[in-house]
Amino acid sequence: MEISIDSLWSQVLERLQIELSRPTFETWIKTANAERLENNCLVIITPNPFARNWLQKYYITTIANVVQSILGHPVEIYITVAKGEEFEEIGGGGAWELPTTNSIYETPNQNRQPNTELNAKYVFSRFVVGANNRMAHAASLAVAESPGREFNPLFLCGGVGLGKTHLMQAIGHYRWEICPDSKIFYVSTEQFTNDLITAIRNDSMQSFREHYRAADVLLVDDIQFIEGKEYTQEEFFHTFNTLHEAGKQVVIASDRPPNQIPSLQERLCSRFSMGLIADIQAPDLETRMAILQKKSEYEKIRLPRDVIEYIATNFTSNIRELEGALTRALAYISIWGLPMTVANLAPVLVTPTEKIAATPEAILTVIADNFDISVEDLKSNSRRREISWARQIGMYLMRQHTDLSFPRIGEEFGGKDHTTVLYSCDKIAQLVESDRGLSQTLRQLSDRIKMNSRSRKPSL
């Protein structure tokens, strides 16, 4: 009896949905499609090479067995990638144009005692997937399902408030659901350093090492703060090696890629880069709206679509800022007993699209710190390549974040001519259109400038 390809694949999906866990099915199977069955070969199309490789490695036998049970005879399975969906490396937010389906994964069992370091809200079910974070989400789920097998280490990279910590802790929650006895350690780099200092002070280094090296999954947040801490880097290097050699999973999060962390030991940079570096970009409008919709659902509040659109359109930097705006809106409406309308929310939702008053001093400090040079170097007439490059980026960002004219920017950089500033700004503007790494660097520097400027703002 002949069967159409659509009917066959529908039956395959129906059976796999029962056989596999919901996260596995939603992430790896549901996004694939059967293209044709000919010459006893079933051709399956995946949205990207990442998904293809994962299916080939872990699920091709399962799929083949299900197809055989339906057709009554064995068939060869060939998995390929949809045309035009080639894998892009870091920064390729637009490369992952999968159907936007926000799978609802099971919330962790509330009866078990979780690690107190893990936020109960940071689970896969509450993470909204979009083109900006799809690769990081898929990699995190893969690690959660099979730690130590692929992507070890997994290095999550992205600006402030984009979901790195959420994904890391979701991995921890998911592992505990599968294996409650797993030793899941989530720690910030600052806490790792503090524990190390305490161990040295108390002469308990052996206990410190045994503790961290006993982890089944080690989740380390904000690794960029390891810069300049030589002894911390030394200890983390050996901890990393011990876990990796034992097949244990290491997940690291940072606001920048390993090769952009100043004063990071080369051997650590090499190890951080040996797995998968998954970049998370700022969410697009559709994803921001989905985030607001999901958060309102968890808060059991119905938001008018125009309110969602207004908040999503005006709060664009990161998820933390977006959710903060929603929280302020809900509090304001609740306190004053007003209808939920854009007009009523206008007084409390002062949009951050206004240019933050970044000072030239703050920008110079951030640039100097990032490129490991001094502010005096930036203001000097040195033509050394690294100083000249940092100076050009600084001029470009000062133009972006202040209202200073080209001559005034030149003055801030030690009295440079306005034509020098103009040339630098034009050069960086042209390069950023084709250099994804530079674009990411500029975003990260802009985030730091904004944070630096906020911290310098006097209290009212």
Swiss-Prot record:
Keywords: ATP-binding, Cytoplasm, DNA replication, DNA-binding, Lipid-binding, Nucleotide-binding. Residues 1-73 are annotated as: Domain I, interacts with DnaA modulators. Disulfide bonds: none annotated. ATP binds at G161, G163, K164, T165. It comes from the Bacteria. InterPro entries: AAA+_ATPase, Chromosome_initiator_DnaA, Chromosome_initiator_DnaA-like, Chromosome_initiator_DnaA_CS, DnaA_C, DnaA_dom, DnaA_N_dom, DnaA_N_sf. CDD domains: AAA, Bac_DnaA_C. One of its GO terms (cellular component) is plasma membrane. The keyword Transport does not apply. Residues 73-116 are annotated as: Domain II. Pfam families: Bac_DnaA, Bac_DnaA_C, DnaA_N. It is found in: Cytoplasm. Plays an essential role in the initiation and regulation of chromosomal replication. ATP-DnaA binds to the origin of replication (oriC) to initiate formation of the DNA replication initiation complex once per cell cycle. Binds the DnaA box (a 9 base pair repeat at the origin) and separates the double-stranded (ds)DNA. Forms a right-handed helical filament on oriC DNA; dsDNA binds to the exterior of the filament while single-stranded (ss)DNA is stabiized in the filament's interior. Oligomerizes as a right-handed, spiral filament on DNA at oriC. Domain I is involved in oligomerization and binding regulators, domain II is flexibile and of varying length in different bacteria, domain III forms the AAA+ region, while domain IV binds dsDNA. This is Chromosomal replication initiator protein DnaA. It comes from Trichormus variabilis (strain ATCC 29413 / PCC 7937). The gene is dnaA.
